Amino acid sequence: MKVAGLEILRCDAGWRNYHFLKLTTDDSIVGWSEFDEGFGSPGVSAVIERLAARVVGQDVFDHERIFTELYCFTRPAAGGVVGEGLGAIENALLDAKAKALRVPCYVLLGGKVRDRVRVYWSHCATWRVNHPTLYKPAITSLDGVKALGAEVREKGFTALKTNIFLYEGGKPRGWRPGFGVPFLPELNVDKDVLRNVRTHLAAMRDGAGPDVDLLLDLNFNAKTEGYLKILKAIADFDMFWVEIDSYSAEALGYIRRQSPHPVSSCETLLGLREFLPYFREQAMDVAIIDGVWNGVWQAMTIVNAAEAFEVNIAPHNFYGHLATMMNAHFAAATPNLRIMEIDIDRLPWDEEVFTVVPQFENGHLVVPDTPGWGTEPIEEAIKAHPPKGPGGLLHYRRP
């Protein structure tokens, strides 16, 4: 079964766009993958389009050969958006291969070790604060944060992850200088930030109650000194983990050894080579792996390495429903799994765009058992929601 063509489709996803790769075969089987250009990775589509000619005509079943060949051709610029393009191609090949064999994708990964995957409600409060016209009800005060914490518990979810907010006149504003909002390239953490972190976490805990696990995302928003200040300031909170990305494995290991809470990291890394320094340094308690970026087959090699270093993993997943299903198969086949990320706040038209949407039971995602990834984008629905211009991080305005 040969690859006959690759096509990129896009649609409006509120503050960003959804991106899909459609891979057709000479047997009329269609393989799908979801990728992203909104999280600091403009140009993935161009990579896929440039490499497509090297993929067409090759055997779908030879996805490891295809990936390795494409890696060889792009070796001088490996990683980055090039690596994400390779991951998107690999994931579409896996979907087509599984459909040809009439099996779920987790079978290709060694079979599932669980039927359900525990998830945490990610960007809890974040989307409702940053994008109040898209995600309802908008959060404009600490009372809104408390109400959302209660909503998480009442909907049966057992864990949530939130971000940092500054409360000016009682109204929250996102604080993410690592991503240019506000533009503070020195990444210093002052007393106002420390007070506001505590205020926000206390409100979330008050609403969610004592039994919901609380996670905090600090990724790239401080330097080593600042991370240690925040960890010290929230030492008395019961945290499931604090998420910290650092370019230095040694710095992260130093932070972890002083942290009162478990540390998770590495969601932006591509390929096993980039993970190894962090494993060797014992720099994190949980390794976060992006199977959308890496390609799920390649991600499994990172899973196996993590196991050798006694580290559990968590899939990075804040995309559309296809990516969630891709990660569900990834998580289902991973023995050393900690938990999986998912965005529960969705756009009004999300369910229109996919043939099947994720199903949850008691805070767990039910792993689909139909061939392939278990869902597909609906092309007519994609056309009904045309993509906007620059989406994602590039769309944010400097305050």
Regions found by a protein language model. Give the residues of each.
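Structured beta-strand/loop patches that form or line metal/cofactor-binding pockets in enzymes
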Residues: 1-36, 346-353
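N-terminal amphipathic alpha-helix/helix-capping segment at the start of soluble metabolic enzymes
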Residues: 1-14, 103-117
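Shared catalytic-loop signature of beta/alpha-barrel
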Residues: 46, 51-53, 65, 232-241, ...
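Metal-dependent enolase-superfamily TIM-barrel catalytic cores that perform enediolate-based chemistry
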Residues: 116, 120-255
